[in-house]
Amino acid sequence: MPVIRFYDGSQQVYEHSVSLIEIIKNKKPSIMKSLIAISVNNHFSNLNTFIREDAFIEFVDQKNYKALNIIRYSCAQLLSYAIKNIWPLAQIATSNIIEDGFYCDIDFKRSISEKDLILLENQMKTLVKREYNILNKLISYSEAREIFQKCFEKYKVSLIDENIHCNSKVSLYYHENYADIDIGLQVFNIKFCKYFKLQKIGGVYWKKNKNNKMLQRIYGTAWTNKQELDKHLDYLNELEKRDHRKIGKFLQLYHMQEESPGMIFWHNKGWIIFNELQNFVRVKLKEYKYEEVKTPLLIDKLIWKQSGHWDNYKNAIFTTLSEHREYCIKPMNCPGHVQIFNSRLKSYRDLPIRMAEFGSCHRNEPSGSLHGLMRVRNFTQDDAHIFCTREQVRSEINDCIKMIYDLYSTFHFKKILVKLSTRPEKRIGTDSLWNESEKDLSDMLIENHLSFEYQSGEGAFYGPKIEFILQDSLDRNWQCGTIQLDFYLPLRLSSFYINEKNEKKVPVIIHRAILGSIERFIGILIEECSGNLPTWLSPVQVVIISITDISSGYVKELFKKFSDVNIRIECDLRNEKIGFKIREHTLRRIPYILICGEKESSSKKISVRNRQGHNFGMIDVDFFIKKLQKEIITRNFYQMEE
């Protein structure tokens, strides 16, 4: 008498063994049309399966939150099946699901093209129209091995040999006569896999080992219905339009080249943005009483060994030799700041010391992970290190939080998420010290009326931390700011101060970053604004365009007037149609376009329009300059409306 328990908490008792179809008819017959899978004791089962003992059953229809991944697992192996249909000699290595989609890695004699993606997608659609059932079979290790050996699928044989014990069963899924290793629960029938799109081709080493063969990876996305697929494709199109790499190239902000991977060649316009952002942070540093320092790019490897960075990060550290001495190209600023702190004796009266640097850091990131300004090998950290007593920690944390929000408020991100990472299993320091430190951080967040999420066990081994995550208008999260307590580094590098009892005491270090990396933050801003940066950050703030040659003298006069008050301005005297000029400078994301013709020249006024197409009409020059200067000085995120 099997007792069947259901996901909703109900149960049903049967007097004899019963098929899944019969259970469905008794429990929920209406679900049959939308049922994509059934899980019995957390394992996929066919509809004709008979249940002979107690079981836990879950019906998965298209509305179930698990449906999406089940469809994506199915599409991943549908893609493998399509590949084998078109290119029988191609070797399927692995397939799996990822966020928003799926992929398949293949070993093929030639490079796969965009045209091939269309061919494969059409083949997948043809297979879906057959509405075949997907079968799951458990077979022996030797049977599974033999199946893939006969098909010359060496990668599948390798996966079986390495991951499955010779006495174990192997779970295979069958798409018609095509067998593949079970990677996850799949749909009953391929008809539920209609809504997919193949997207791009990439490269990946077998088992992520650069000593192995490079495979070709085909990426796709899949959804439960057409509306969700279309919505996702629209989202991807919007991402492509906002891609900082494309916008950066079009606006001539920077470039990167093969001879210096992960390093940025800043052009004049991009460097203006960089410096404006850096100067803005400098204003805040002064306001919050930081001292700016500069530490060497090269520091003896011995320091990095003493600090512990060499043991933990040596694979990411560039090194160089000089006169039989090995140096590290700094991957971070903190050990250098400790050297400045240690350079002279400190009293408790000197603390807190807030030390900031725009440090040029280098990290040997894998070439495959490099991505425009977002992931580079050379970047500028806007971090700071606060050396303070234990009693000063709460006050300093509070000021750090205020400074971070003060600066972020200028950029009007959709939301700021806050996470508090607590003690990991492996850590230094006593439980009482961790209790006190975690309470310091949480109390300061609460005092500032900030909601936050705990990340249990995610803190560094040397102290808890707060992360500030910026959410953009496309709901993407960017982790930028951090406040990190550190009890470890000052101990490792022998830092101390003299307290009021004339005793040596080890200071606490607070690591504080706001933008994180200036380069990455510029990339985030470009994508958030689609290149339409606020006026104060725009490389060119105003362009004056002439209608005819008659007004060229007045254009030059205006150019000087704006330049004299440090407004970044260009003039366009080309003999082109006015509509052409306006469109060109709008595409260049220049905030304000001033139009000068005979009417403007004779009245000594200007016609103004912004890059959104709003026409202000003809206005007084000095009035406009005054309004523009106010917009720039206040670092207004939005343009003037009148």
From Swiss-Prot:
It is found in: Cytoplasm. Transmembrane segments: none annotated. Residues 1-61 form the TGS domain. It catalyses: tRNA(Thr) + L-threonine + ATP = L-threonyl-tRNA(Thr) + AMP + diphosphate + H(+). Pfam families: HGTP_anticodon, tRNA-synt_2b, tRNA_SAD. Its cofactor is Zn(2+). GO terms for cellular component: cytosol. One of its GO terms (molecular function) is metal ion binding. The keyword tRNA processing does not apply. One of its GO terms (biological process) is threonyl-tRNA aminoacylation. It comes from the Bacteria. Keywords: Aminoacyl-tRNA synthetase, ATP-binding, Cytoplasm, Ligase, Metal-binding, Nucleotide-binding, Protein biosynthesis, RNA-binding, tRNA-binding, Zinc. Its EC number is 6.1.1.3. The keyword Phosphoprotein does not apply. Its main location: cytoplasm. Zn(2+) binds at residues 334, 385, 511. Residues 243-534 are annotated as: Catalytic. PANTHER family: THREONINE--TRNA LIGASE, CHLOROPLASTIC_MITOCHONDRIAL 2, THREONINE-TRNA LIGASE. Belongs to the class-II aminoacyl-tRNA synthetase family. Homodimer. Catalyzes the attachment of threonine to tRNA(Thr) in a two-step reaction: L-threonine is first activated by ATP to form Thr-AMP and then transferred to the acceptor end of tRNA(Thr). Also edits incorrectly charged L-seryl-tRNA(Thr). This is Threonine--tRNA ligase. It comes from Buchnera aphidicola subsp. Acyrthosiphon pisum (strain Tuc7).
